[in-house]
A protein has these predicted regions:
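N-terminal "mature-chain" segments and other terminal, solvent-exposed stretches
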Residues: 1-5
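Contiguous beta-strand segments within globular domains
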Residues: 7-25, 30
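Surface-exposed coil/turn segments at beta-strand junctions on protein surfaces, enriched
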Residues: 12, 32, 65-69, 85-87
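Short helix-loop boundary/capping segments
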Residues: 23-62
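Internal, hydrophobic beta-strand segments that form the core of beta-sheet-rich folds
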Residues: 36-46, 84-111
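Intrinsically disordered, low-complexity segments enriched in serine, threonine, and glycine
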Residues: 51, 66, 79-81, 86, ...
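A beta-strand/beta-hairpin structural motif
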Residues: 56-82
Length: 121
């Protein structure tokens, strides 16, 4: 059972993740009670020999769980270069929320959220 059932494109140079025509209610398996989903990506360069690391996190994109097709672009603010000799790790994070009186609350203290390693180079 996968949380995300949508295709995406990862640009390994910039760390950008692109979803074309994402339909949240059809392509994201949300827990009962969720009204919104947040997506972000992370780009980590880690040099295992020197322990030098650089992490870049994209701004969060928050969407209602509806049937509207939406293009989503998750772009880290900079390239995670570290020393330039490390390993690049690419992550995708999905978090669920419930809207109550126009305030979004995390469901069950984040127990339904997912962080997936999507590529290593």
């Amino acid at each position: 059972n996968s949380v995300l059932k949508a295709q995406y494109h990862l640009n390994v140079t910039t760390g950008e993740v692109l979803f074309t025509d994402l339909i949240p209610v059809q392509q994201i398996s949300a827990p009962t009670g969720a009204t919104h989903v947040s997506l972000s990506c992370e780009f980590l360069n880690l040099d295992l020999e020197t322990d030098v690391k650089a992490l870049q996190i994209s701004p969060v994109t928050n969407l209602p769980l509806n049937s509207l097709a939406t293009n989503v672009t998750l772009t880290p603010p900079a390239t995670a270069t570290g020393t330039g000799t490390g390993i690049n790790f690419y992550f995708l994070k999905i978090a669920f929320f419930q809207d109550f009186n126009e305030i979004q609350y995390t469901l069950n203290n984040g127990a339904y959220n997912a962080l997936q390693l999507i590529e290593i180079i």
